[in-house]
């Protein structure tokens, strides 16, 4: 029961969702206007692509963080060189662009396109406006984080926006060209539709590299999570509702709680590990009948056990790049992974305490300073009154009789 109650509390209120959407849309319009007025390319002709948990409708608790991609126009003739198992790349232009081509400013030796230069240029560009505040750069992050405040005050931050410059490329690299394994889940036709979509490269730095790009499938992940049903009618009405998204939101909440409780020990852990486990689980447990709302508790337990199993085996293949292990020692240190396994086992053993709602606190009754809270004193006073009240009443009647009766 408490898992269902917790899941209800994770949903963002419709009023808050509408308010946040209006604010972010206003920000997006202002940023586009700002970029169009600048002569710096390729940002002047950039376009937005919404991504992240809010637009997947799995954001939990509050609509205070948004992710957006800023699509940059580049030459379609690009050459990619895989740096690891197909997640990170060097990108080179087939030939050196002409001096009039604005992308030339970001090209290094051997026609290599610089991820660090594009990210730095974007930082410099967005600092020139007063409608938002640019946050400090985070190590190896592909995003420029902006904070939005009320126009009439410099008080608390209202919304944080991660703005990620991204190169849109139509051709998929060889290692991922077959697409994700969704045949049993969403069908072969849907898989072909996915394969026809472009992919994106974001300026994410691989450890030991300075000019690397990471391949991003966030726009396709959004499609998979929104069109999650084995049948097209899934979640179209209350009759065909499923509990997939609620299970994912519960897992996000658990990961968030673990990160807050053990920030140092679980530093490598992030929400994307949870998303990857969720995508794999939806692909294997594809039948809609396995995800009915009545089975929420059991379904979440299965999802949790899948997360625990991946951690214990030290194997979590990227959903789109299966050769890339998100739990490999190179990206997730063995000590941190062992700690993750232990805390997941502890959570399971103790009944998932991080997801339990806090016990209600009894209301506090206001009391006067002179009020005695001792039960013994209260009992004595009551007994005394019970004994002497009849005698006092009889004495009062006798006095009145003497006073008025004698006069008569």
What residue ranges belong to the model's regions?
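Catalytic cores of NTP-dependent nucleotidyl/adenyl transfer enzymes across multiple folds
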Residues: 59, 94-309, 390, 399-401
């Amino acid at each position: 029961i408490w898992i269902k109650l917790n899941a209800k509390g994770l949903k963002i209120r419709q009023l808050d969702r509408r308010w946040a959407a209006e604010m972010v849309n206003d920000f997006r319009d202002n940023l586009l206007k700002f970029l169009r007025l600048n002569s710096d390319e390729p940002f002047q002709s950039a376009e937005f692509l919404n991504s992240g948990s809010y637009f997947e409708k799995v954001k939990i608790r509050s609509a205070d963080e948004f992710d957006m991609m800023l699509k940059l126009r580049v030459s379609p003739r690009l050459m990619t060189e895989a740096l690891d198992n197909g997640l990170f790349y060097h990108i080179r232009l087939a030939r050196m662009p002409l001096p009039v081509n604005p992308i030339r400013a970001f090209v290094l030796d051997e026609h290599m396109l610089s991820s660090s230069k594009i990210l730095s240029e974007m930082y410099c560009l967005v600092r020139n406006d007063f409608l938002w505040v640019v946050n400090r750069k985070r190590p190896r992050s592909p995003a420029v984080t902006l904070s939005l405040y009320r126009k009439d005050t410099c008080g608390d931050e209202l919304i944080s926006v991660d703005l990620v410059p991204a190169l849109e490329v139509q051709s998929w690299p060889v290692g991922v060209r077959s697409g994700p394994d969704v045949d049993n889940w969403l069908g072969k036709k849907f898989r072909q539709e996915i394969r026809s979509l472009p992919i994106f490269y974001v300026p994410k730095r691989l450890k030991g590299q300075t000019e690397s790009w990471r391949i991003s499938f966030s726009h396709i992940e959004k499609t998979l999570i929104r069109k999650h049903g084995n049948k097209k009618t899934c979640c179209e009405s209350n009759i065909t509702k499923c509990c997939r998204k609620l299970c994912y939101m519960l897992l996000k909440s658990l990961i968030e709680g673990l990160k807050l409780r053990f920030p140092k020990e679980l530093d490598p852990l992030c929400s994307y590990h949870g998303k990857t486990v969720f995508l794999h689980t939806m692909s294997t447990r594809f039948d809609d009948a396995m995800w009915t709302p009545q089975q929420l508790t059991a379904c979440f337990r299965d999802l949790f056990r899948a997360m625990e199993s991946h951690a214990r085996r030290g194997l979590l293949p990227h959903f789109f790049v299966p050769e890339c292990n998100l739990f490999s020692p190179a990206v997730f240190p063995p000590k941190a992974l062992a700690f993750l396994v232990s805390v997941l086992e502890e959570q399971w053993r103790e009944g998932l305490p991080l997801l339990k709602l806090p016990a209600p606190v009894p209301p506090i009754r206001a009391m006067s300073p002179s009020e005695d809270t001792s039960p013994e004193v209260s009992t004595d006073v009551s007994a005394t009154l019970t004994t002497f009240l009849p005698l006092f009443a009889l004495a009062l009647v006798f006095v009145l009789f003497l006073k008025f009766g004698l006069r008569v």
